[in-house]
């Protein structure tokens, strides 16, 4: 499953990471899980984005702060699900 879009600091989209990391939508390099990092869209966008699992102020499945499910950044909400661990 090659769910990633290799953009370095750009806009990740679909199943894809913003920072060109592997897996289904990384937040930054080597971060796996669903939900791209910054300004992405589709499955897991980053800052103020939309879709599954946005990071900051987004909506959908699992935002970073107080979010849940797929596409969190912080291990407090991500580690338990095994999605998109920040560390």
Swiss-Prot record:
GO cellular component, one term: cytosol
Induction / repression: Expression in skin and hair follicle is regulated by HOXC13 and by GATA3.
Region (21 X 2 AA repeats of G-[YCGS]) location: 6-72
Top-level taxon: Eukaryota
Keywords, ordered alphabetically: Keratin, Repeat
UniProt entry tagged with the keyword Lipoprotein: no
Tissue expression notes: Strong expression in narrowly defined pattern restricted to the lower and middle cortical regions of the hair shaft in both developing and cycling hair. During hair follicle regression (catagen), expression levels decrease until expression is no longer detectable in follicles at resting stage (telogen).
InterPro entries registered for this protein in UniProt: KRTAP_type8/19/20/21/22, KRTAP_type_19
Quaternary organization: Interacts with hair keratins.
The protein's role, per its UniProt record: In the hair cortex, hair keratin intermediate filaments are embedded in an interfilamentous matrix, consisting of hair keratin-associated proteins (KRTAP), which are essential for the formation of a rigid and resistant hair shaft through their extensive disulfide bond cross-linking with abundant cysteine residues of hair keratins. The matrix proteins include the high-sulfur and high-glycine-tyrosine keratins.
The family this protein is said to belong to: Belongs to the KRTAP type 19 family.
Protein name per the record: Keratin-associated protein 19-1
Protein's organism: Mus musculus (Mouse)
Higher taxonomy: Eukaryota, Metazoa, Chordata, Craniata, Vertebrata
Gene: Krtap19-1
């Amino acid at each position: 499953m090659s769910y990633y879009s290799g953009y370095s600091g750009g806009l990740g989209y679909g199943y894809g990471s913003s920072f060109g990391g592997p897996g289904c939508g990384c937040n930054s390099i080597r971060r796996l899980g669903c939900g791209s990092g910054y300004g992405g869209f589709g499955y897991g966008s980053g800052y103020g984005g939309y879709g599954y699992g946005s990071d900051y102020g987004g909506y959908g499945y699992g935002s970073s702060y107080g979010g849940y499910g797929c596409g969190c950044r912080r291990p407090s909400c991500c580690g338990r699900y095994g999605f998109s661990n920040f560390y």
